[in-house]
Amino acid sequence: MPKLTSAQIKTALPAVPAWKKRSATITRVFVFKDFPEAVRFVSRAAALAQKAWHHPDIDIRWNKVTLTLTTHDQGGLTEKDFALARKFDALPTARGAEPARPPGRGLAV
């Protein structure tokens, strides 16, 4: 699968709005009610990744799971990354996960 051009990436990103492009990757933080819920999500995500034979970088921090996708052998993003991102997005919906919100700026006085 060929590496996507900048224009192709820009076109693909709206289909995965919770994912953020960072360099040659796309990343999403999923937030769950607790650690066991986060781990259950990771287990389901791992099964999807194994089936697709495309494995994300996974970081678990208590109730937050960060998934990062790139296609290493192509040196950047491919349609494979966006297809798997869409599959991951379908997992937490039924379990109530939400995208992480950026930290606020605090209260203005």
Mark where each language-model region is.
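Charge-rich, low-complexity N-terminal segments
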Residues: 1-16, 21-109
